Amino acid sequence: MNFELLATDGKARRGRLTFPRGVVETPAFMPVGTYGTVKGMLPRDIEDIGAQIILGNTFHLWLRPGTEVIQRHGDLHDFMQWKGPILTDSGGFQVFSLGAMRKIKEEGVTFASPVDGAKVFMGPEESMAVQRALGSDIVMIFDECTPYPADHDVAKRSMELSLRWAKRSKIAHGDSPSALFGIVQGGMHEDLRLRSLDGLQEIGFDGLAIGGLSVGEPKEEMIRVLDFLPPQMPADKPRYLMGVGKPEDLVEGVRRGVDMFDCVMPTRNARNGHLFVDSGVIKIRNSVHKHDDSTLDPTCDCYTCKHFSRAYLHHLDKCGEMLGSMLNTIHNLRHYQRVMAGLREAIQQGTLAAFVDAFYAKRGLPTPPLDA
């Protein structure tokens, strides 16, 4: 992987990631393909909406169908017929999400499989081996996602464990040609975040992610971390904010120097009839749309907006037709890609402030302040 920083506007960065499988323009949003599929989307649909990289889930693919099945096809790209780059998360967040079903020790995590209840163990070495088998273009270290809230002592122990696991992940990654990203932890504590960052830089990674956000903390806390952390991260490596978020969150992350994002929100909300447009969110199942023959978003160039009315989308949603979820997903993911394309162009042109002001004005919101 090669990362080029092409332009800056304030803290915001316009860059380019180059892989053997393709180029990713940054800032970038990565659709989430948990089980080797972006729900409701054919691979050609993902290309059509402008996504250049997607995310796969190490934990779930390891448990089902398993790496042996996937490797019979070659790797995850071949299995799901996606030609572009794939980032795989390490499984750490999913293990964290199991709560009482898992036991964390120095060696790794033992847990009951959510598939069949069997006792399963995963540590840094296992995570790296699975991601290598998947043929990931970007591999994430195995870490512990610090819970929220966590006092200083709890967050410190968690962060230090993640650093030890980061070293083991780097060793286990070995001579793999895939990029390896570290993950900054430390909860909401600035000193721990900076110690985590220093430790990861000593180990050496191809890129760095910000983990442990969007885990239940108030948005103000997330913004506070994003105000102080990205400026401390190396300028010559990509910065990835994990699991975030709404379009507004992407804009605020980019304003603070983040390059990469992923989130299930656009796909999950699409299946629930919540559709993102420039003015905010349209709840397509509401009865007000039953007789509305207008397009969902006249500014959008997606297949859904080019061909179907709000009334038709409302009808599909009320009937529970799978086509409704598919068309909604196409639109939501295209909306996210359009936001990212607008951010990239604005940074390139040095007009980010105007873009952000217009973005919020369309939503009837004031532009949030930005620390210098």
Curated annotation (Swiss-Prot):
Q: Which UniProt keywords apply?
A: Glycosyltransferase, Metal-binding, Queuosine biosynthesis, Transferase, tRNA processing, Zinc
UniProt-listed InterPro entries: ArchSynthase1/Queuine_TRR (IPR050076), TGT (IPR004803), TGT-like_sf (IPR036511), tRNA_ribo_trans-like (IPR002616)
Q: Care to name a GO molecular-function term for this sequence?
A: metal ion binding
Catalytic residues at D89, D262
| One Pfam family it belongs to | TGT
State a GO cellular component annotated for this protein.
Answer: cytoplasm
Region annotation RNA binding: where it falls in the sequence: 243-249, 267-271
- Report the record's Gene Ontology biological process terms: queuosine biosynthetic process; tRNA wobble guanine modification; tRNA-guanine transglycosylation
- Name the positions where substrate binds: D89, S90, G91, G92, F93, D143, Q185, G212
Cofactor dependence: Zn(2+)
Record EC number = 2.4.2.29
Q: Where does Zn(2+) bind?
A: C300, C302, C305, H331
Q: Per the annotation, how and in what number is the cofactor bound?
A: Binds 1 zinc ion per subunit.
Q: Does the keyword Phosphoprotein apply?
A: no
Q: Which domain of life is it from?
A: Bacteria
* Catalyzed chemical reaction(s): 7-aminomethyl-7-carbaguanine + guanosine(34) in tRNA = 7-aminomethyl-7-carbaguanosine(34) in tRNA + guanine
Q: In which pathway does it act?
A: tRNA modification; tRNA-queuosine biosynthesis
Member of which family?
Belongs to the queuine tRNA-ribosyltransferase family.
Question: Subunit structure of this entry?
Answer: Homodimer. Within each dimer, one monomer is responsible for RNA recognition and catalysis, while the other monomer binds to the replacement base PreQ1.
Q: Which HAMAP family match?
A: Q_tRNA_Tgt
> Function, please?
Catalyzes the base-exchange of a guanine (G) residue with the queuine precursor 7-aminomethyl-7-deazaguanine (PreQ1) at position 34 (anticodon wobble position) in tRNAs with GU(N) anticodons (tRNA-Asp, -Asn, -His and -Tyr). Catalysis occurs through a double-displacement mechanism. The nucleophile active site attacks the C1' of nucleotide 34 to detach the guanine base from the RNA, forming a covalent enzyme-RNA intermediate. The proton acceptor active site deprotonates the incoming PreQ1, allowing a nucleophilic attack on the C1' of the ribose to form the product.
Protein name per Swiss-Prot or TrEMBL: Queuine tRNA-ribosyltransferase
Species, as recorded? Pseudomonas aeruginosa (strain ATCC 15692 / DSM 22644 / CIP 104116 / JCM 14847 / LMG 12228 / 1C / PRS 101 / PAO1)
